[in-house]
């Protein structure tokens, strides 16, 4: 062990100018004299023990030969840090106040060329930036110009993610100001391709990864996340990403994209958002054989092993972040999605966007479409192609709204809704073989195996596609819908675009321009007989950002179905006669933050009414309160 005197001598030598030059005046790149090397060896030993006092002497004190060899490497590399090995690590120091070079690489505080002259002097930025000082608006204009040069959507996505990693406020300012143009870039449909290629385009981790390797240590993994005041978590296990299937760990693009929209559209602070991927393996052989795959290379865990990890995760979230953190389940396979929602809805603040979010936005579209086609919700007949999470979730919310309006039992209201899965129409004769979540939708009817036969037999006024299978709304099907409906309501909801049941152009052309159409993925306006039809997009982004904000500002501890109905009814009221005349049953996204504030106010009001809110007293004007709580991405001035 070094004596206290020797340690002090070594520390003083480290601060001396002789540290950087030999006695003979040699430069710092040279090896220096023997005595200087000895001083450096002793100073290095002091630093090692200061950083890790419990290290054994054999690690702290290196042999002279080893040290001399490392000094040669350090001299060539240009610094003491190059002397580090696995046995003698360096400490990754971080400063409490970012300045200079560090500040420019901090995405939470970086402003690029928008740093003022005063800020450049105060934070040691002078010379690290070109002389020009520009506004945030000009930065937005420049980036939009650059993005429009890319012809491939994935290139735009990568450029946007790169911006988010460099300058967080500029990213959200860009997205908010150009939401209609950039929404398809940061989310569907482009995010689907990004997830498929996530391993290849992976640059920097975003979010938190919890894998089977972390079993028994999930609490510690969550503690590694730097933020503590988390309000919204979006979590996926990657088994059913959009309509693309099992993408394993590469499904992280979905939670990242969703939470970007929570901030941009709903105003939830970025630091309060946490994207998480639960990696339990993948059954996708292509990914397992892909050298760039970033997840566990094993078959997907199921049963007890899977549910034990999820139980540990849910318990850890509640322990660290409390019971008022909203946990949004995203893109879980049917068999897990329904089980997880049923299991945790009574003990946690949970929300499944594929089941509940999709249902809420589609119900809003249906309520809005009634202003075009006439009648009440109970007077229409509904046929779904697809009986998974989305299909059954929408069907249940329709039945709940009908029950609310008519005061009829929910079982009676379900009879207005028919579902068709891969084996045909869901009828009573199939009840024994049906999964539990499909059984409420089995009605008395003869077996029907094809969609066209079901349409001709049931004669629905509303046809909704949630199958994930493209081109299933054929010309014959849409012509049949148009033959007995003056204004057939056709929702082609599957994502991405390639999986859509039909395109907007097909729906309008095959119905002679009479269809009331909405889709899950965006479509361009369609001209038919001289009239421009603007297809509405039944995008969950209308609902979940405002819904989440409403939960946050009310301090709700549980999600109730009446809160979903309140969100639907509020969104339905936002579409105007001008929108209807253009053919759209949804309002434009240009006003989405105002819409989100109104939805948040409705959701919060319902939470207070149901006794689920904990943030007391209740604000007098919930809409104004919601707006005041929303994150704005304008630059802040620095001292």
From Swiss-Prot:
Site positions for Important for activity: 354
A GO term, aspect molecular function: malate dehydrogenase (decarboxylating) (NADP+) activity
Gene3D superfamilies linked to this entry: Malic enzyme, N-terminal domain, NAD(P)-binding Rossmann-like Domain
List of catalytic residues: 187 (proton donor), 258 (proton acceptor)
Cofactor note: Divalent metal cations. Prefers magnesium or manganese.
GO-annotated biological processes: malate metabolic process; pyruvate metabolic process
Organism the protein comes from: Oryza sativa subsp. japonica
EC number(s) per entry: 1.1.1.40
Protein name (database record): NADP-dependent malic enzyme, chloroplastic
Top EC group: oxidoreductase
